Amino acid sequence: MRYISLIIACFSILTMQAQKELVIINTNDTHSTVMPLSSNLDDTLKAGRAGYLRRLALLEEQRKAHPDLMLFDCGDFSQGSPYYTMFKGEVEVKLMNMMKYDAVVLGNHEFDNGMDNLARLIDMSEFAWLSANYDFSATVLKDKVKPYVVLERDDVKIGVFGLTPKLEGLASIENIEGAVYKDPIESAKAVVSELRSESVGCDVVVCLSHLGWNMYKQMDDSTLIANTSGIDLVLGGHTHTYFEELQYVKNAEGKDVPVDQNGKHGIYIGKQRLFIQSKE
């Protein structure tokens, strides 16, 4: 787990004498790795690692130091083990409830057993399910998936929204019937504008993305950031890319936006520390 520090300037939330810290733990593409990976794997970086019990223990330790930490998943916690095959996501969701996730973005594998099953999982979950660039109003997911959620920590408002890749070609047609894909860039612009508006008033905006990293001639996190502004942090997934350190992409205003992604199976997770200070 890496320790990342970001400083985000806000206009009015703090005096010059004070600075507030937000802590985020992020996972992606854990793919139903409920049990640790086999200790017999040739890849010694993976052998015997991961597993939900380890993550639970780590989160317990982190919450002792940071009681108000936020916990996000960037998609594809589904599919990859007999637990998912047999129980169709119920095991994973119940364990994520135990871990006290705040929000997840829909990845493509969340649709592997269709939207009826996904609706069942959402109903048993205790966290928000996000996707700002899909319209599910003609499906059983209507009103169950939100474009964003607003969290508050120490009088700081954090807007968190999700982006899902185009599911055509990634999920069976019958499993996504009625779901309408919307352009991620335009969707992000609209939701960021709403989150930054006076009526919502977010101080920080975080994107949970399952678009992927370095997707050749396809929509990905770099393309998203380059064509938008107002996003402070992108937490990514989908391509199973492991960042040894944060990557930075210039947004439409020329500002560097940090991006994180942590491989797959939950072998690694991310920890972001955001220091919020006033802009004087």
Regions found by a protein language model. Name each.
Residues 19-280:
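Acidic, metal/ion-coordinating pockets
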Residues 1-21:
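Bacterial Sec-dependent N-terminal signal peptides
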